[in-house]
Amino acid sequence: MHCDIYKFPKRSEMYVYIARPDYPNDTDEIKDWLGVLPKDLRQSLGEPKFLMHLDLAETKKLARVNKDDVIEKLQSQGYFVQTPPSDVLLAQAQARMKEGQDKRYD
């Protein structure tokens, strides 16, 4: 299973894997690979930045997620979202909360 991995500046430490089941035979025409994402999710992520192309069959393991879980989601829905570790999510939530409070009392 081949996939492309994207990151999003609005979402630190979040990565989206997009299935490329027909690779390399799918490169003849330009395609919106992120079109498989639900519209609301895609809009909330902001502008994508391509990171890399990955052949999961050649990859023994992934850094923070289970490779089998990634493959299952790629096959069933065409994408996999790797969320940030819980400590990063907590820090982001706290920063947004503080920012909201600061704006409220300015």
Swiss-Prot record:
Q: What is this protein called?
A: YcgL domain-containing protein PsycPRwf_1721
Please list the residue ranges annotated as the YcgL domain.
1-94
Ranges that cross the membrane: none
